[in-house]
Amino acid sequence: MSAVGQRGGSTLAAVMLLLVMGLMLLNAQHRQLDSALLLAADQQRYLKAYNQAASALSWGVAQSWPRNRLGVNGWWCQQTEELRACAKLSARAGIVLVRGDGAMSEGEPLRLYQLTKPDGTGGTFELSAEVGGWLDFCPEKREADCAD
C-alpha cells in the first residue's frame, strides 16, 4: 500500500477513542444521577413522614384526653383523616407521654414523642408540654412500655 492510502487512520482511531471515553463518562454520570434521584425521593418521603409526625404530635398535645382511658399499660389514640396521636401515662409519676405518628411508605411509622404534664380535674384533662420534652425516641426505660 502506498503512504497516501493510509493517511487519516490515526486521526480516525483518536476520534473513536474520544467517542468511547465520552460514552463511558456519560454512562457514569447517568448512574450517578439515578442514585441521586433515588436519594432525593427517599429524603422527600422521610421529610413528609417527619412533618406529618410533628403535626400529629402538636395536634395531640392540644387535644383533651379522657382521664379514664389513659393508663401505663397501653396507648390510647385519637386521629383525624391525616393525623394520629397517641397518649399514655408514663412510668414516671405525673407525666403523660404523647406520640405523633408519621406514615412511611413501608415498614414502621416515624414516631415523635413529647413529655407533658396533665392539667384539669374533670373527666378529661388538657396537656402542657414540658420544656425540653420533645424527643425522637421513646423515653421509657422498658421497651415494652413503648410498644403498641
Across the structure, where does each feature detected by a protein language model lie?
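N-terminal leader/signal peptides at the extreme start of proteins
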Residues: 1-7
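Conserved functional hotspots that engage anionic ligands or polymers and/or phospholipid headgroups
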Residues: 10-13, 17, 27-31, 36-51, ...
